[in-house]
Design a protein with these regions (language model features):
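Conserved ATP-binding N-box helix of the HATPase_c
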Residues: 3-6, 79-103, 160
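Conserved short strand/loop->alpha-helix "switch" segment adjacent to the catalytic nucleotide/phosphoryl-transfer site
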Residues: 38, 64-85
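Short beta-to-alpha transition helix within the HATPase_c
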Residues: 38-60
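Glycine-rich acidic phosphate-binding loop
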Residues: 93, 119-124
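Short beta-strand/loop element within the Bergerat-fold HATPase_c
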Residues: 100-112
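Short conserved segment of the HATPase_c
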Residues: 125-137
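Conserved glycine-/histidine-rich ATP-lid loop and adjacent helix of the Bergerat-fold HATPase_c
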Residues: 153-165
Length: 185
């Protein structure tokens, strides 16, 4: 019998039957927390880059945990600058982290600014030690060739856009993590 729109009711029952079958087949499939965070990211370029970094970390036997609670595209800072900062901070964390550990990347809105931080397990650093790492040509790597410009470039970016450098030590599950980040308009 047709409904008031002229459609036959049994097609709806058939569609519901198909939906139930599909739901039954996919019931055990879930979406990971990182995938959920990537899908919620307002910048598909940043989400794509983060996906690549997650895969890079997995190859190095590391885990990256994302917590994205800010809109990159709603800031004064261009997406390309965010991509550079995220890439530098994650590359440094991946290189410095012991195998099997977790790196945390977080973004959140702070008033008119977006705070981005990357945390990785490491011995505690003093404020002086943190800030010295942002000097031009300063590196912790054995080979100095072509190194020592990442954090310096982040410092220059914060100066260009009137942002701030964020550094601190943080205890996560009784382990020290060093936190590097930016607060950008």
């Amino acid at each position: 019998m047709p409904d008031r729109n002229g459609k036959i009711f049994y097609t709806s029952i058939t569609s519901l039957s198909h939906i139930s079958k599909v739901a039954g087949l996919t019931g055990s499939i879930g979406i990971s927390l990182n995938d959920r965070e990537l899908l919620s990211c307002d910048s598909k370029m940043i989400a794509g880059m983060l996906f690549g970094k997650i895969k890079q970390a997995e190859v190095a036997n590391l885990h990256i945990e994302l917590s994205l609670h800010g809109l990159f595209k709603k800031t004064v800072t261009p997406e390309t600058e965010w991509i550079e900062a995220i890439g530098i901070l994650l590359d440094n964390a991946i290189e410095a982290s012991p195998k099997g550990s977790t790196i945390f990347l977080s973004s959140k809105k702070q008033g008119d600014f977006l705070e981005l931080t990357v945390s990785n397990p490491a011995p505690p650093l003093s404020n002086t030690e943190f800030m010295a790492l942002f000097g031009k040509g300063v590196t912790t790597k054995a080979s100095r060739d072509g190194h020592g410009f990442g954090l310096y470039n982040i410092l220059r970016m914060t100066e260009r856009y009137h942002g701030k450098i964020l550094t601190r030590n943080e205890s996560i599950l009784n382990e020290n993590y060093v936190v590097f980040g930016v607060l950008m308009p």
